From Swiss-Prot:
Protein name: Guanine nucleotide-binding protein G(i) subunit alpha-1
Its job: Guanine nucleotide-binding proteins (G proteins) function as transducers downstream of G protein-coupled receptors (GPCRs) in numerous signaling cascades. The alpha chain contains the guanine nucleotide binding site and alternates between an active, GTP-bound state and an inactive, GDP-bound state. Signaling by an activated GPCR promotes GDP release and GTP binding. The alpha subunit has a low GTPase activity that converts bound GTP to GDP, thereby terminating the signal. Both GDP release and GTP hydrolysis are modulated by numerous regulatory proteins.
Lipidation positions, renumbered (S-palmitoyl cysteine): C3
Post-translational modification remark: Myristoylation at Gly-2 is required for membrane anchoring before palmitoylation.
Membrane topology: Peripheral membrane protein; Lipid-anchor
Region annotated G4 motif, chain positions: 265-272
PROSITE patterns reported in the protein's UniProt record: G_ALPHA
Organism: Oryzias latipes (Japanese rice fish)
Gene: gnai1
Superkingdom per UniProt: Eukaryota
Domain G-alpha: 32-354
Length: 354
């Protein structure tokens, strides 16, 4: 009776080694795959973050892809000026120059008859004259009292360029476009040897029931908050302040039993708009108990505390907060680099890969 292995035993041993090797490879592959769930109330900047991932981690938008956004740029621009003109009626604001009333009538006629993806010289002229009117500007300065696209001034101030016959949207123009996200948008990219799958979920509450099957096995949640929402009402629920709506949603996500082991990254977004607004619109609109100054630093720190205090598991769960401007590529690049390091530290060190 010798100790030599039979041919069958050797084959079995080889098979066993191969299975172990495959399992190890699969384990490494799984460890390198990062699932990110982007959550937040409507218009908090989630889709802009996704666009930035394409710009930062892929080749960005090709000229052909940029051209496809032309119709959206025009639609956003036209809808913005229409929203302001309609709000003037509700807020009882008159045109500084009464001749603009004819332009307003013309705007509605031309907007209804212009082919999608085109901006005629006549329509551009009407919009330009309206935008320069003192009454229109007065109404624009009260935009917290009605729903207006954040990019309204960006496009309207640049009407000469975007209405030009040879206009092709820039990457920044594309970043500023607003199209309501419905359903789930999945984006894949590689960064720091990790394979990211990012899921952008429709922000409006009517869409939230669609999130559920995205949750399983998610590595981290990036929760976006529009800081500038503190003095707005929400489109779907005129009774609830936008910031309170975000806090309510964050509470339900942060303390959800499914996310006990999930890293929660909080993006307090639109910091640029917040910095402008806080000079003239008091934080007490949203937080009556706030007794601090209306400086950006103090007000922003207070909002951060309000969100972080919602975490009921402070002893075991850390919230990683970043102030962001989703339309600023350098800022998003810097923040996402820090976010990736947190993901590596929290989720991947155990595998011995990093």
């Amino acid at each position: 009776m010798g100790c030599t292995l039979s041919t069958d035993d050797k084959a079995a041993q080889e098979r066993s080694k191969m299975i172990d090797r495959n399992l190890r490879d699969d384990g490494e592959k799984a460890a390198r795959e990062v699932k990110l769930l982007l959550l937040g109330a409507g218009e908090s900047g989630k889709s802009t973050i996704v666009k930035q991932m394409k710009i930062i981690h892929e080749a960005g938008y090709s000229e052909e892809e940029c051209k496809q956004y032309k119709a959206v740029v025009y639609s956003n621009t036209i809808q913005s000026i229409i929203a302001i003109i309609r709000a003037m009626g509700r807020l009882k604001i008159d045109f500084a120059d009464q001749a603009r009333a004819d332009d307003a009538r013309q705007l509605f006629i031309l907007a209804g008859s212009t082919e999608e993806g085109f901006m005629t010289g006549e329509l551009a002229g009407v919009i330009q004259r309206l935008w320069k009117d003192g009454g229109v500007q007065a109404c624009f300065s009260r935009s917290r009292e009605y729903q207006l696209n954040d990019s309204a001034a960006y496009y309207l101030n640049d009407l000469d360029r975007i209405s030009h016959a040879s206009y092709v949207p820039t990457q920044q123009d594309v970043l500023r476009t607003r199209v309501k996200t419905t359903g789930i948008v999945e984006t894949h990219f590689t960064f720091k040897d990790l394979h990211f799958k990012m899921f952008d979920v429709g922000g409006q509450r009517s869409e939230r029931k669609k999130w559920i099957h995205c949750f399983e096995g998610v590595t981290a949640i990036i929760f976006c908050v529009a800081l500038s929402d503190y003095d707005l009402v929400l489109a779907e629920d005129e009774e609830m302040n936008g910031m309170h709506e975000s806090m309510k949603l964050f509470d339900s996500i942060c303390n959800n039993k499914w996310f006990t082991d999930t890293s929660i990254i909080l993006f307090l977004n639109k910091k640029d708009l917040f910095e402008e607004k806080i000079k003239k619109s008091l934080l007490t609109i949203c937080f009556p108990e706030y007794a601090g100054s209306n400086t950006y630093e103090e007000a922003a720190a207070y909002v951060q505390c309000q969100f972080e205090d919602l975490n009921k598991r402070k002893d075991t769960k850390e919230i990683y907060t970043h102030f962001t401007c989703a339309t600023d590529t350098k800022n998003v690049q810097f923040v996402f680099d820090a976010v990736t390091d947190v993901i590596i530290k929290n989720n991947l060190k155990d595998c011995g890969l990093f």
